[in-house]
Amino acid sequence: MMTNFKFALKNLKVNFTSENIDKLRFYIEKVLLFSDRFNLVSNNVRNFDAMLLHALDSVSGLPIVKDKNLRQVLDVGSGAGFPGIVLALFDRCRKYVLLERSNKKAIFLKMISLELGLENVEVLEHNVEEEQNKYEFITIRAFGDIRKYANILGSILKSGGLIMAYKGKFDKVEFEMSYVKNLFDKVEIKSSEVISDKERYFLLLYDYKC
């Protein structure tokens, strides 16, 4: 499975070292080890290969991040660290701010970022509605229906910024897009093809209007 992960990284044109791979393996093992204690992942995905698929899905967004040539990314609802920790691990030149409302998960994120030596990670512990700063790039994954949070996320998006939402089935993404397209200057659905047997897309929301 790790061989497939490396192959996917090469297809995505993501540079990596053996240290990156070792740290990813360490991270996944820590997620599995501390899942019960910190309420990190559901029971049905508590195995290494399932976690590696989450990591692969996470890193698939990195080319979009790099294409924007920005200095900082906000990951809202970071949970166990997918995608925030994974992106930060393979993209050390950018700062990743991980926003997580759960105290337990925020503690884990702080712990694992220290153990991985991720100096480009900052963890914030509060609700997204309480965030005061604005960001040029925002990521969300496993965050529910975008219709509920579009205005909230838009309010902390800098002018000219981009929200990248990791999504599943196309018909659902298209349905959500129809409700939020008038809130942004441009809305786009982009296919993610790194996991061949799963339907995955990015919903990209450019420049909040309100």
Curated annotation (Swiss-Prot):
The keyword Transferase applies. It is an enzyme of class 2 (transferase). GO terms for molecular function: rRNA (guanine-N7-)-methyltransferase activity. SUPFAM superfamilies: S-adenosyl-L-methionine-dependent methyltransferases (SSF53335). It is found in: Cytoplasm. It comes from the Bacteria. S-adenosyl-L-methionine binds at G77, F82, E100, R101, S102, V128, E129, R141. InterPro entries: rRNA_ssu_MeTfrase_G, SAM-dependent_MTases_sf. Keywords: Cytoplasm, Methyltransferase, rRNA processing, S-adenosyl-L-methionine, Transferase. One of its GO terms (cellular component) is cytosol. It holds the Pfam family GidB. Its EC number is 2.1.1.-. Belongs to the methyltransferase superfamily. RNA methyltransferase RsmG family. Specifically methylates the N7 position of a guanine in 16S rRNA. This is Ribosomal RNA small subunit methyltransferase G. The lineage of its organism: Bacteria, Pseudomonadati, Spirochaetota, Spirochaetia, Spirochaetales.
